Every structure is written in structure tokens, then in C-alpha cells.
């Protein structure tokens, strides 16, 4: 029930995108970014055990010091993803995740992302709850997810090359992507 309340609250933020139109004060991008900030605030309260990292801080980290996981559906990942990210099924449980990826992670910082942070925060919290006390490497959710990354014009890749497209998840959530013409439900043709 609490998850449903979270989704309804986040949907209200998205719907507000279409309703707020101050002719002189806000651009569409400002409105979208404010919706992402509001969504992040809601997620931070809901998943209060999860630490977050923003795109700027992540881009300054040594690439060998972290491992990044994309916690979206496979079709979203195929359209685009952050370079070197590893796809993870959003429904994976913590023990399966640890069994499958613990050797790759080692002592590296773990970064998870999805569209805006719902699915990745959920997985990050599961991992935090079940991790042994001996493991001290940080687990982060990427603040504002791949939508925030994309809105800041940071690089994305597909299976074949770099791309400017991002999967919008659905029409409602996709309204948080600044450039409508760069939303795409299918990967680019090879």
C-alpha cells in the first residue's frame, strides 16, 4: 500500500509538469528538473537507508573504483544506458544479486540507476538491508536516474554506438525527459 502511495505521489509530480506554465519564470526544462528534484526528495524519504550520488560526482570518480548497474527492463537498457553499466532485472532479489555479482563488485563502490530512481532505490535498499557487516564499500543510487543524466546531456550508449536517445519508460514518466524528440521505445536500427 505504501508503494502505491509513493507511485501516486510521484505521478502527481509528473502531472504537475503539464499544469504548471508560468509564462515568464520557468522554461519547460526548469519545470522538468524541478519534477525530478521533487521525485528524488520523495524517494529519499521512502528509501531512507539509501545513499545517493549525483551525476557530477559520479563523473569525477575513477572508473575503476566503481561498478554501475542499470536496474531497468531489458528493452529500456537496449535503447540506451550509461557506458559500462551492467543490466540487472529490476525484480532480482538481494541474495540472487549478491550471488551473481559479488565477484565482479569486490571492494568497488556500487552505483545503481533506473529511469528516475524508484527501481534502483528499491534494489539499493534491499542490498543495504542484507549486506554483511564486513562489507563496507558504499552503495549509491544515481540521483535522478538516467533521465537526469540524459537531461544534463551526458553520454549514453546503445549496443552498437553512442546515442542521444533514452527510453521514456512510459508516456507519463517520459515527461521528465527534457527533449521529447529524443525519447525512443525501440533501439536504433543497426
What are these regions (language model features)?
Residues 1-10:
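Bacterial N-terminal signal peptides that target proteins for export
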Residues 2, 24-51, 78-107, 121-190:
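Rhodanese-like catalytic fold shared by cysteine-dependent sulfurtransferases
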Residues 9-20:
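Bacterial N-terminal signal peptides
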Residues 55-64:
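A short acidic-Thr-Gly-centered motif at the start of a beta-strand
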Residues 64-66, 106-109:
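Loop/turn elements at helix/coil->beta-strand transitions in domains of secreted/extracellular proteins
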Residues 67-72:
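Short hydrophobic beta-strand that contains or immediately precedes a catalytic carboxylate
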Residues 115-120:
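Gly/Ser/Thr-rich loops at beta-strand to alpha-helix junctions
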Amino acid at each position: 500500500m505504501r508503494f502505491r502511495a509513493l507511485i501516486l505521489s510521484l505521478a502527481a509530480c509528473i502531472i504537475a509538469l503539464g499544469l504548471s506554465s508560468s509564462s515568464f519564470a520557468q522554461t519547460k526544462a526548469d519545470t522538468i528538473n524541478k519534477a525530478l528534484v521533487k521525485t528524488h526528495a520523495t524517494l529519499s524519504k521512502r528509501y531512507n537507508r539509501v545513499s545517493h550520488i549525483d551525476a557530477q560526482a559520479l563523473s569525477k570518480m575513477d572508473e575503476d573504483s566503481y561498478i554501475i548497474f542499470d536496474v531497468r527492463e531489458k528493452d529500456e537498457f537496449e535503447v540506451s544506458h550509461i557506458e559500462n553499466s551492467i543490466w540487472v532485472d529490476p525484480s532480482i532479489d538481494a541474495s540472487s544479486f549478491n550471488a551473481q555479482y559479488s565477484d565482479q563488485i569486490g571492494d568497488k563502490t556500487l552505483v545503481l540507476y533506473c529511469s528516475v530512481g524508484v527501481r534502483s532505490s528499491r534494489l539499493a535498499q534491499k542490498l543495504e538491508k542484507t549486506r554483511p557487516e564486513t562489507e563496507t564499500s558504499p552503495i549509491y543510487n544515481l540521483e535522478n536516474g538516467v533521465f537526469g543524466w540524459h537531461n544534463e546531456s551526458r553520454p549514453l550508449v546503445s549496443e552498437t554506438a553512442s546515442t542521444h536517445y533514452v527510453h521514456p519508460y512510459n508516456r507519463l514518466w517520459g515527461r521528465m525527459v527534457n527533449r521529447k524528440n529524443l525519447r525512443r521505445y525501440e533501439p536504433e536500427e543497426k
